[in-house]
Amino acid sequence: MGKNVVVLGSQWGDEGKGKIVDLLTEKASAVARFQGGHNAGHTLVVDGKKTVLHLIPSGILRDDVTCFIGNGVVLSPEALLIEMKELEDNNVPVRERLKISPNCPLIMPYHIALDQAREAKRGSGKIGTTGRGIGPAYEDKVARRAIKLADLFRPDLEEKLRNLIEYHNFQLTQYYKVDAIDFDTTFALCQQWRDELKELVCDVTEALNQLRLAGKNLMFEGAQGTLLDIDHGTYPFVTSSSVTAGGVSTGTGIGPLYLDYVLGITKAYTTRVGSGPFPTELFDDVGAHLAKVGHEFGATTGRARRCGWFDAEALRRAVVLNSLSGICLTKLDVLDGLDEIRIGVGYDIPESEFAAAHDGEFYETVTPKYETLPGWKGSTVGITNYDDLPEEAKAYIKRIEQLIDCPVDIISTGPDRDETIVLRDPYDA
């Protein structure tokens, strides 16, 4: 029988999931996205060539891998078509490899307008969204008024769209004092999207299940990271979807008993983009060093990432939330040359803080407790054998395993798929 592997972020996103998914899809027949939208940014480097994907699963570069976009994804047809064209211009036959659930809610122009108007109105209290309409699209889904991909092919689309635009325009013009969304322009877009995407629509749940029954290896690719989960993250500084392993089942229709291994991707330090609490954040030369050496700029937004020491307490929480089978530690090479390396091993919690919450307010009030380990002078760049790592690097990895009670199964030592140490392959575990 085949194995079903979940790959997801276990920090605040940007952990390097794209490279690892691309690496592991060598053994997979299909890759499925299960949540998020084009606010994700997955960077792949293959033979020195860089590709950035936002919606399409990272397995698209593999000749024999089918890629699925599950119902848990909010789909921007406009962004998808742009991404498809970029890949097709590079001779990637996207239409032969990509299938999309008809139950994906669509991101419409009014969602983007609402997202941007809200962030502007919040001023200094902004959440730090990408402004791409993700949150408002999920709101329409939960409120049971979303236009889904399937609706593009139904006769009542015009009436449904007209009512929705009227509903959202009232808020846009009367409360936010911005321009209304034009119905005719939006309806014409919907007709264009219908024609462009018709051949890609597929019952994703049934297709994945048939592959499973045939004994094929499947992969489920997460976007963002555990600490951005709508339920378990640093609320309200979170995304609008279920980022944890539980989101796989709701976002694809493949039940939890069919998931065999959950891999948590985590950097050897910690980063965060945008607003929100970050207990181990660094504001000194070391933080600047990590940002510079790690090229810490978001693949989607281009925003500089905030950098800090590894937070083992937050990761221990992610291990529990996702029932992680193993960890992939990325960007170990960024720590090369540091005299000492600190690990956040726990928190001092104010007596007044409601410690059970583990939300944004909780993380804002805690003070991290640190443990200091010696750094290493040798380079880890491109190392593919664990025994070749500096002894101090091995000690750092072992200490992380002890603190989070989860094995480090994969270590990434550079951006290329070949710059990797695989201690335990998820498909062989």
From Swiss-Prot:
It catalyses: IMP + L-aspartate + GTP = N(6)-(1,2-dicarboxyethyl)-AMP + GDP + phosphate + 2 H(+). One of its GO terms (molecular function) is GTP binding. Its EC number is 6.3.4.4. IMP binds at residues 14-17, 39-42, 130, 144, 224, 239, 303. Its cofactor is Mg(2+). Homodimer. This is Adenylosuccinate synthetase. It comes from Psychrobacter sp. (strain PRwf-1).
